[in-house]
């Protein structure tokens, strides 16, 4: 775990240096540390960023702590760097995938429960309401379509409205995969 945390920080820090990204002179945590907290939360704390912040602070990985609201604002400012990091890691995974076999699957991202749909401010269209057969429930939100290698390493993703089927969502999406690549998916 220790080496993974240090590796994540080094990747984030090198990416920001490569992009000539500058931190504010008054900030107590660098943007690389903000990105590291978010990634460590996803890797080890099931997305719980408060627990990851507390853990990294107690273990001495980060020197200063900031409030939850300040952390969320800072995290929103580096969202484009996360996409760049994901794309770079995806390109590396594609280069190492000698089999050229990829798996495509989708999973729902529920914005709210069914009884709160009328009050939802993010999405107001019926295209976002769909049925999730595996859990036997309706959801309201988006679907994330992931392209992964045989080992499960994500290389690409795209979002679509929840009611859009997987096959219909593939039409406008242009894969950035090698020409001889095989894409395997289910019929859902």
Predicted regions and their residues:
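Short alpha-helical elements
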Residues: 1-188
